[in-house]
């Protein structure tokens, strides 16, 4: 099976008007060579308008180019997935659509990746899961945030599920790089 999609988009994000009258093009393709296996590539090229350039004091549009490649195997309660993402284009001083000042200090490249797996320990009842992920907001190791997770999912019924996870985080942007998280979550489906 082969799937593709492409779109031409206007605007600066959800409920945001267009600031530079330019369009973004977003598309993707994926193939499914065997049942349960999907391999894909996705891309986005466009601009973000009305950005204040701190070096000139004027507003301008900045280019943004992003792509991702991914692979997934999902069959008989076994799931394995990996993805790499890359972004090129200047970011804003802080997150959100209301901040319109270019941040040259962070550079114009970022990337990240993750791999994870879920396997059944007791079919239909108990699954073990593990995940490793990295995000580098300057596409270098001195700004990386790395996270290792492991956990269990227990299904009381098809509509009631308990998740338990332990995570170790190494955030090189912080003075104290390493910290740990424990997360418990109860999901109701209706």
Task: Give names to the regions the model predicted.
Residues 178-190:
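Outer-membrane beta-barrel "beta-signal"
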Residues 4-10, 41-45, 82-86, 130-134, ...:
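Transmembrane beta-barrel strands of outer-membrane/channel proteins
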Residues 60-98:
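Oxyanion-binding "anion nests"
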Residues 1-38, 42:
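Aromatic- and glycine-enriched pocket-lining scaffold segments that form the walls
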Residues 28-30, 68-72, 116-118, 151, ...:
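Outer-membrane beta-barrel architecture
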Residues 1-4, 36-39, 77-82, 124-128, ...:
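Repeated loop/turn-to-beta-strand initiation elements of outer-membrane beta-barrel proteins
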Residues 31-35, 74-77, 121-123, 154-160, ...:
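Outer-membrane beta-barrel strand-turn architecture
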């Amino acid at each position: 099976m082969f799937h593709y999609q492409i779109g031409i988009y206007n605007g600066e994000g959800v409920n945001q008007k267009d600031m530079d009258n330019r369009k973004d093009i977003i598309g993707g393709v994926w193939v499914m060579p065997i049942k349960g296996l999907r391999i894909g590539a996705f891309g986005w090229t466009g601009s973000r308008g009305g950005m204040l350039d701190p070096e000139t004091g004027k507003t301008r549009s900045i280019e943004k180019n992003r792509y991702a490649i991914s692979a997934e195997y999902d069959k008989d309660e076994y799931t394995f997935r990996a993805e790499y993402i890359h972004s090129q284009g200047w970011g804003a001083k802080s997150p959100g659509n209301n901040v319109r000042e270019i941040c040259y200090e962070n550079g114009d490249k970022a990337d990240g990746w993750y791999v994870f797996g879920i396997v059944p320990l007791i079919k239909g009842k108990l699954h073990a899961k593990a995940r490793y992920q990295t995000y580098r907001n300057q596409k270098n190791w001195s700004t990386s945030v790395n996270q290792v997770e492991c956990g269990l999912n227990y299904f009381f019924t098809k509509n009631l599920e308990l998740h338990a996870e332990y995570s170790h985080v190494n955030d090189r942007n912080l003075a104290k790089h390493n910290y740990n998280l424990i997360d418990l979550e109860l999901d109701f489906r209706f």
